[in-house]
Amino acid sequence: MALLPILEFPDPRLRTVAKPVTQVDDSIRQLVDDMFETMYDAPGIGLAATQVNVHKRVVVIDVSEDKSQPLVFINPEIEVLDEELSQYDEGCLSVPGFYETVERPGHIRVKALDRAGNAFELQPQGLLAVCIQHELDHLNGKLFVDHISPFKRSRIRSKLEKKHKAGVR
């Protein structure tokens, strides 16, 4: 396994729309393993392949406290089951050090393939539902900062650009 470099906002590669995985093979399973290692090391609770500059529709998530519930979503698709919105303070490994309140549907259905290529379906609520939507945004070239005001987004961009110019990670 290997740690992968995580792209940081405003890197334009984060805006790339990921392509579907055509076959779940050893290279995809290796990517999944590397993504989990990277996510746990960061530390984070979710990581999309786009964030590590691999533009395939692959997401890894583990919202457990003890890293005991790893979930893999390959070619995920979501359906909103309840239009009622939930508010969560979201952060992102690609927008380090910033957290903002984002509204998202609180109950969804997700269909995807697992690490072995088997189809599955979940109906998560709460934090897991929010995390899945956040990571799927990455696969579609979106970031959580796209859900906040242009002023706040501009402020975050400016602070991160200054940090990058100073060579701080």
From Swiss-Prot:
Chain residues that bind Fe cation: C92, H134, H138
Disulphides: none
Superkingdom assignment: Bacteria
GO BP terms, alphabetized: co-translational protein modification; translation
Catalysed conversion reaction: N-terminal N-formyl-L-methionyl-[peptide] + H2O = N-terminal L-methionyl-[peptide] + formate
UniProt keyword annotations, A-Z: Hydrolase, Iron, Metal-binding, Protein biosynthesis
Gene3D superfamilies: Peptide deformylase
Transmembrane residue ranges: none
Cofactor note: Binds 1 Fe(2+) ion.
HAMAP family named in the record: Pep_deformylase (MF_00163)
General function of this protein: Removes the formyl group from the N-terminal Met of newly synthesized proteins. Requires at least a dipeptide for an efficient rate of reaction. N-terminal L-methionine is a prerequisite for activity but the enzyme has broad specificity at other positions.
Family per record: Belongs to the polypeptide deformylase family.
Family annotation (NCBIfam families): pept_deformyl (TIGR00079), PRK00150.1-3 (NF001159)
Name of the protein in question: Peptide deformylase
